Every structure is written in structure tokens, then in C-alpha cells.
């Protein structure tokens, strides 16, 4: 079948993106040095920066001596201050969100998501898709439906009034407009609880769609596919979604 305008346009965009990322990969030391200086310049006036004597122009060795490697518990005193709504603690201003992790090692953890860090989450996903298009010369998946298996996009608030949720649920609010028309499942299905009810709702919404891409934690995707095959009676996923081609 003929490709859509979106599919055709994605190829030159993918070529430009791949060239840019290849250039970045070719100068890792210079780029990391510039990044360190940018981070130092912006963090030196935060509480963490002052507590550790961070200054623009510090060498890598000076930075390593000033900020020893530590686990989450070592950062927790500063994180707790930011969670309560104090500004300029770990990064200038207030975080937009706190990502609450499941805490498999030592209880729940709160990871600040700032306006400066959010583009890293959405940009890396975009670059991965563009790299696939560039390498495979295939952009047909953009013409079909895409499932994003995520945590609930419902957000709560910290004691300091900052939005909080699972990382994938937070990122769900920042999926670019050019993917929204093809995006599944619905907001309502994504918010269902418990997990089994959510999977059932997503299967019902998607089983008759032209799915071409799925993204999510492997165990979640496996759970979805297993339920899909139970409901449809199909022998494999390809029987249900003949045009399915990409798992991110």
C-alpha cells in the first residue's frame, strides 16, 4: 500500500537525526567535558552545589573529589527538601514532577524531573525511532497504531504541591502531537486498576486495530500479549496484528 505523507517525511528527518547522533558519538570526550561545565555552571548556586563547593571551571578530578559516588540514601536529605517544596536544592528552581519508583532495594524513591530533564526522556525515544527508520529504510509503522504500555497517567501531589507519579505515567503527558492520533490505549484504559483490569481493557481496545509498534517494560508487554492470545484464540501475535514490526 502507498506510504502516507508522514511516512515519506520521516525518512529525511531520520537521516538528519542519524547524522547528528553519529557526530555526537564521534566526540564523546569533548561533549562530556562541555556537559560537565554546563552542569557545574547551573548547579553551583543550588543547596547541593554550595554544600559541595561546586564552581564553574572545575576539572573532572576536582568534581570527583567534591562529589563522591553515593547511593540514593546519600542523596535523600536533599531530595526530601525538594519534595517538601523547597526550590534550588538539587537543581535551579522546582522540579515539575517527582517520579516515584517501586523501591525494590530500600523502599520508595523520589526522582526529580525538571523542565531541563524532561526533553531527555521524550528525545531519546524519538531518536530511537528515527534511528530505526534510518537503518531499516522502513517507516511503515508510523501509518499504523502504536501501543504505549505505561504506568497510570493519574498524578498525585507531594506535600510540597509538586506532581508525582510513575515515570512512564508522567511521560505519557508529554507524547508529541505527531504520535497522538496513532496512540493507544485511551487515557481511561490507562488509568484502570488493578493491573489485570487494565490489561483486559487494553486488549479489548486494541485487538481489532492495525497495531505496528508496541512500547513498554518487557514483562508488561509479555503479559499483554498472553492475554491478547487468550481472548482472540490466535496462535501468535502476528495472526492478530499482521503488520506488527517494532517493539521498543
Task: Specify the residue positions occupied by each region the protein language model found.
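Active-site phosphate/ATP/adenylate-binding loop shared across adenylate-forming ligases
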Residues: 3-31, 36-248
Amino acid at each position: 500500500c502507498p506510504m502516507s505523507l508522514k511516512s515519506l517525511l520521516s525518512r529525511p528527518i531520520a537521516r538528519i537525526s542519524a547524522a547528528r547522533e553519529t557526530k555526537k558519538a564521534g566526540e564523546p570526550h569533548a561533549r562530556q567535558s562541555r556537559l560537565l561545565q554546563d552542569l557545574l555552571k547551573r548547579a553551583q548556586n543550588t543547596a547541593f552545589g554550595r554544600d559541595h563547593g561546586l564552581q564553574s571551571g572545575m576539572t573532572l578530578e576536582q568534581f570527583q573529589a567534591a562529589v563522591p559516588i553515593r547511593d540514593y540514601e546519600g542523596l535523600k536529605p536533599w531530595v526530601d527538601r525538594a519534595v517538601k517544596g523547597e526550590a534550588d536544592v538539587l537543581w535551579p528552581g522546582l522540579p515539575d514532577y517527582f517520579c516515584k519508583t517501586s523501591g525494590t532495594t530500600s523502599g520508595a524513591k523520589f526522582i526529580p524531573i525538571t523542565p531541563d530533564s524532561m526533553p531527555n526522556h521524550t528525545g531519546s525515544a524519538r531518536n530511537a525511532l528515527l534511528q530505526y527508520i534510518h537503518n531499516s529504510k522502513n517507516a511503515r509503522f508510523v501509518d499504523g497504531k502504536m501501543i504505549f504500555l505505561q504506568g497510570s497517567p493519574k498524578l498525585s501531589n507531594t506535600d510540597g504541591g509538586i506532581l508525582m507519579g510513575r515515570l512512564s505515567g508522567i511521560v505519557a503527558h508529554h507524547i508529541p502531537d505527531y504520535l497522538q492520533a496513532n496512540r493507544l490505549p485511551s487515557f481511561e484504559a490507562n488509568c484502570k486498576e488493578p493491573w489485570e483490569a487494565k490489561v483486559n481493557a487494553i486488549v479489548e481496545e486494541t485487538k481489532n486495530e492495525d497495531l505496528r509498534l508496541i512500547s513498554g517494560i518487557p514483562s508488561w508487554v509479555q503479559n499483554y500479549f498472553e492475554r491478547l492470545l487468550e481472548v482472540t484464540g490466535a496462535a501468535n501475535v502476528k495472526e492478530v496484528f499482521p503488520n506488527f514490526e517494532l517493539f521498543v
